């Protein structure tokens, strides 16, 4: 069959095939739908009526019975080649023929289609000219976003989105990205304190730091829940006239004295005597003058000395003291009766076991307070842009504390989570509960079993009407408070240890304290450091905690032996390896976290010292354990006796008064003694 007449306008005319169905005749709707152009003399009509007719004609043509008996070759029809070079064939609707368009016509058609495209749809990924984004374009984009953020009337969700886009546009080096590589850690580290494997490697893919809800806006963008923005959310910022406003030379001890004096002068006291629902009596005036509680600003806080004086109320007493110092009673109108009801019931829910008891909970709470209250030398704790919801610190402050950068709601959540974080701990590890198919492991699907249990059970306790001390929070604050508490508690699972450290080091140069997720990340670091702080304490305290964790491990080993299970490493009472346990724990778990926080200036440094006392104590304690390992491996009995002026029992060096809870000075044998005396 000879070809038909030449194509006109780039579209082949219909070709008749003997015995076939009538040729397809392009209609007005056909041109509009396929080529985005209007036949001569026609105006565009996008009315719903024509759209419906077009769909009807298309369906009729497709299902026409006349085409049912036509061969594939007949339905395909003939192809008319255009005289232009490089033409592109376009399929004809219904598959009855094929036409061609020139390159120029196709380009015009594409641009016309882009002009008609809905602006709410995702951006098209095709590029006809292959243009690339330049640095100047990025700078211009960041400038435009900065100008938009200057508008104080922007909705909260829009401002959050713009800040997130600004961070994505930043391209800065990550100085601590390879920090974990410096420790020579293997890809998988066995957790000596839990018997589980911890993965050391690249962090998970970057997750947006914005929490989106369902798509409800007219533009198709997901909405962002607005952050509570109340005066009290940033009320921990102190004015110059505030009695608790510190200068660069003040210490938290000075602040405690000022707060106490100010409280007495103003008469702003909670009820003098509070009696809980179970009859426990608290005298708040006595709590305000407790000499042990006056030492909360010291890292070597005498926790065991206080526990001997108040064995059943140590956690509630310490929590009251810290809440008072942070002025949380006044800011959130906390009921003293409900406060003591909850925290006393909470401490009663801790088991009488060697390590994971109410003393450990109080120690973690103290660690969170110490790390957040002392000034640190981190550069990213200063607000970076003028649209911050937080008031900037005093311009003459050389250093700022983490406490001054967190909202009071975040502070209360951090302190509450620290007190709750090991509630109802049975003295067994997650791995043990999974292995014996404990009901808690079944309930939480073997994932963060104990951490989920602590969070769920302690929150149930808090929700009791007589314990609900957060009753004056509004719904948004309540939701945020619960979210923060759960995140902080779940972060104490050591299986997340390296993931949190990697996330922090990767975001180090981008961290902005105005961003909720960055403040949450800092809070996770604080509670994690407080939870494993034992090796960073003076040796006297560290040795007491070591004896306690070993005894709890031995009890699990005894249980495993009774059940006929393999005994977890370091938990066999007949094969004590205390020095190796602590060496592994410090090298693989504590040191990476402490070093990362110290490198970025998140650990407090006392006046007169070049580095944090936590790092000094950790290195000192680690050296002592490594020396003991060397002696156990090859040292003589006489060498063990004379080492460090201590005595040796069964090959284990014991310094005098170091491992007894009656030691009057918890700083005994600390390398800081000589430094501070100088």
Swiss-Prot record:
EC number: 3.1.4.17
Amino acid composition bias (Polar residues), ranges on this chain: 60-85, 231-246
Region of interest (Disordered), residue spans: 1-27, 52-95, 223-250, 654-678
A biological process from GO: determination of adult lifespan
Record InterPro entries: HD/PDEase_dom (IPR003607), PDEase (IPR023088), PDEase_catalytic_dom (IPR002073), PDEase_catalytic_dom_sf (IPR036971), PDEase_CS (IPR023174)
Catalytic residues identified in the record: 356
Top-level taxon of origin: Eukaryota
Cofactors, names only: a divalent metal cation
Keyword Metal-binding carried by entry: yes
Short name of one Pfam family: PDEase_I
Alphabetical keyword list: cGMP, Hydrolase, Metal-binding
Cofactor note: Binds 2 divalent metal cations per subunit. Site 1 may preferentially bind zinc ions, while site 2 has a preference for magnesium and/or manganese ions.
Family statement: Belongs to the cyclic nucleotide phosphodiesterase family.
Name the record gives this protein: Probable 3',5'-cyclic phosphodiesterase pde-3
Taxon lineage: Eukaryota, Metazoa, Ecdysozoa, Nematoda, Chromadorea
